[in-house]
């Protein structure tokens, strides 16, 4: 039987590998956890953990079905894993568009709205995986674009 410490380590590593890697099957998760030193892990335990933490299968940017944990609630910060959800940042003369992983747009738009006018963002409109950003000033759109890119460590 695992001790509380081992259980805490298992939960921490389980969440970490689901956030950092892309797994299409429960057996892939079992193999990854076994590689981390949890030799007694099996598919049924992984299945229970996926349910317990609300993990779902969704399509990633490559259109592959993968397991993902839901975004954590609370006030998001730029240092949180949200930056990993930004897939593309582009603009024209009047608007900035951010493309995200499916389901992440509203959470990222909330962060952008929270930094608001001081950083050149008048407002946002978010769908499931796309955010339209209206800059405070069209003349300063390049600065606002760079602010957004640096916020999410986005490089083209």
From Swiss-Prot:
Pfam families: Arg_repressor, Arg_repressor_C. One of its GO terms (cellular component) is cytoplasm. It is found in: Cytoplasm. Pathway: Amino-acid biosynthesis; L-arginine biosynthesis [regulation]. GO terms for biological process: L-arginine biosynthetic process; protein complex oligomerization; regulation of arginine biosynthetic process. One of its GO terms (molecular function) is DNA-binding transcription factor activity. PANTHER family: ARGININE REPRESSOR. Regulates arginine biosynthesis genes. This is Arginine repressor. It comes from Shewanella baltica (strain OS155 / ATCC BAA-1091).
């Amino acid at each position: 039987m695992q001790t509380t410490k081992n259980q805490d380590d298992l939960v921490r590593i389980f969440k970490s590998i689901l956030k950092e890697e892309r797994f299409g099957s429960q057996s892939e998760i079992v193999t990854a956890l076994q590689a981390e030193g949890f030799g007694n892990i099996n598919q049924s335990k992984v299945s229970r953990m996926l349910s317990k933490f609300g993990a779902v299968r969704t399509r990633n940017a490559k259109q592959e079905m993968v397991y993902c944990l839901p975004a954590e609630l609370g006030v998001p910060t730029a240092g949180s894993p949200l930056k990993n959800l930004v897939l593309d940042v582009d603009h024209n003369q009047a608007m900035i568009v951010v493309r995200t992983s499916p389901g992440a747009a509203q959470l990222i738009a909330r962060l952008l709205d929270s930094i608001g006018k001081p950083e050149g963002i008048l407002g946002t409109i978010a769908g499931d995986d796309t955010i339209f950003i209206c800059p405070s000033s069209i003349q300063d759109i390049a600065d606002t674009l760079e602010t957004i890119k640096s916020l999410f460590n986005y490089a083209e």
